[in-house]
Amino acid sequence: MFKKLFFASFIFTSILNSQEPNLLGSLLYMEVEADVETEPVFAGDDAADDMCVLENLINPEKSLIVSSDKKFGIIVYDLEGNKLYDYEVGRINNVDIIPSKSSQDKYLVAGTNRTYNSIDLYIFNSKGELENNIVREVVPSLKDVYGITF
């Protein structure tokens, strides 16, 4: 009995101490607190939804906010909340962004599009300009496309 108890205690302690704590946190995200509010979206109501940050690593103050308007498309704001661009691409519900691996000035934005029941991929430049809709993949097996992340 003593051997079994000792062995179980040893295993439990080993598991608890087998990983060092992550004191650095994640390098993939940063918590921020809003100081300003963006201009309202076209549709009003509760149409403003998901957003992501187009992070400008060279000039952080020139980073942008890419947001979805669930009844219109994609809206791009500066960090002061001023609307820079609006793109009528369909009823975009959620958006996410990653920097392009092939170009320092390009970003890949994904969005779920309820108009076409599709997942859309777009190329944006660092100024927030939509350069290309590279993919619109219709997902007929889903009743409603909802949510996306890279």
Tell what function each PLM region has.
Residues 73-75, 116-119:
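Structural signal for beta-propeller blades
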Residues 19-36:
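Blade/loop signatures of beta-propeller domains
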Residues 34-44, 82-88, 133-139:
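A short beta-strand motif characteristic of beta-propeller blades
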Residues 35-72, 93:
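Beta-strand-rich domains and repeat architectures in extracellular enzymes and scaffolds
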Residues 117-150:
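Asp-box/WD-like beta-propeller blade repeats and closely related beta-sheet repeat scaffolds
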Residues 9-18:
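Hydrophobic h-region of N-terminal signal peptides that target proteins for export
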